[in-house]
Amino acid sequence: MKIAEIQLFQHDLPVVNGPYRIASGDVWSLTTTIVKIIAEDGTIGWGETCPVGPTYAEAHAGGALAALEVLASGLAGAEALPLPLHTRMDSLLCGHNYAKSALDIAVHDLWGKRLGVPVHELLGGALTDSVSSYYSLGVMEPDEAARQALEKQREGYSRLQVKLGARPIEIDIEAIRKVWEAVRGTGIALAADGNRGWTTRDALRFSRECPDIPFVMEQPCNSFEDLEAIRPLCHHALYMDEDGTSLNTVITAAATSLVDGFGMKVSRIGGLQHMRAFRDFCAARNLPHTCDDAWGGDIVSAACTHIASTVLPRLMEGAWLAQPYVAEHYDAENGVRIEGGRIRVPQGPGLGLTIDPERFGPPLFSA
């Protein structure tokens, strides 16, 4: 089956109860980029990519649209299958995984619909009918972080990510301590996420002053080299997030025992095809990981849920979705929802969504 047409859209996603605060800045509203692939037989596949602003990573909404215009212009008539698609995309544009991810998701959605099976079957098959999610507490005052931590634990979340950084390290230490005091004894897991916001000095101080708190340190510093520097001196397990930009980087980090796990985003690694390889590599190395994305609506949330359902449960650290911060669903009936800290795995064909073809207005680009 070949691609007949690709249409590109953009859509605003205001942050519910904003801002969402991380070390790189405050987020009030984001622009998501939507891909619609139409096959020769009229089957439609949807994809999506939504960077968290221009400073979180080397990605932004304007760049996504520009890259997708280049890719879409060269994909008419191409095979609508993941491997041929990636081969063709790589011949058209170097890098830009976050843009390629949207096309990858759309092709998986298209083929699932064509075959009448959910995307998770194309990825090897679901191991569960619901996936654990985790809640991310933005950078906030320590007392408020503790209050929200207990609230989310009572809602059913089994893991909390505490956003830290871009302020005195003493406040971050106070925040993680108060969060731990609030949820201690509940069995909830904690991740202290610096989002690249700490110096190596502050990351080491944070770990040394909290040896009694069982958290993992997620991407505390800015670079691969920073992680190498602090690794032998840390008192806590170390996870890679933003630096995990490719399969090659992941393989190197695991082979050198640099990290104990990963926070991985579908868009960062280039889509479900590459995420599947990442999943299998982590299973071979017995490394836990998440299945997330930076931001977005139902389309990218469904993609994350499908791949998360195929991960060995003992290695699955949860799927983070922006859904609690997004006011609307693209599909009011089948939109992805977090309930009791878990996400039901969609069972309909493709991503399991039924989206009105006119939902996002006229396309900004078509090829």
Curated annotation (Swiss-Prot):
Annotated positions binding substrate: 56, 161, 294
Entry's EC annotation: 5.1.1.22
Note accompanying the cofactor annotation: Binds 1 Mg(2+) ion per subunit.
SMART domains per UniProt: MR_MLE (SM00922)
InterPro entries noted in UniProt: 4R-hPro_betaine_2-epimerase (IPR034622), DgoD-like (IPR034593), Enolase-like_C_sf (IPR036849), Enolase-like_N (IPR029017), Enolase_C-like (IPR029065), Mandelate_racemase_C (IPR013342), Mandelate_racemase_N_dom (IPR013341)
Residues bound to Mg(2+): 193, 218, 241
Recorded catalytic activity of this chain's protein: trans-4-hydroxy-L-proline betaine = cis-4-hydroxy-D-proline betaine; L-proline betaine = D-proline betaine
Disulfide bonds: none
GO MF term (any one): racemase and epimerase activity, acting on amino acids and derivatives
An individual GO BP term: amino-acid betaine catabolic process
Enzyme class: isomerase
PANTHER family, A to Z: D-GALACTONATE DEHYDRATASE-RELATED (PTHR48080), ENOLASE SUPERFAMILY MEMBER DDB_G0284701 (PTHR48080:SF3)
Family statement: Belongs to the mandelate racemase/muconate lactonizing enzyme family.
Protein name as annotated: 4-hydroxyproline betaine 2-epimerase
Organism: Salipiger bermudensis (strain DSM 26914 / JCM 13377 / KCTC 12554 / HTCC2601) (Pelagibaca bermudensis)
Gene name of this polypeptide: hpbD
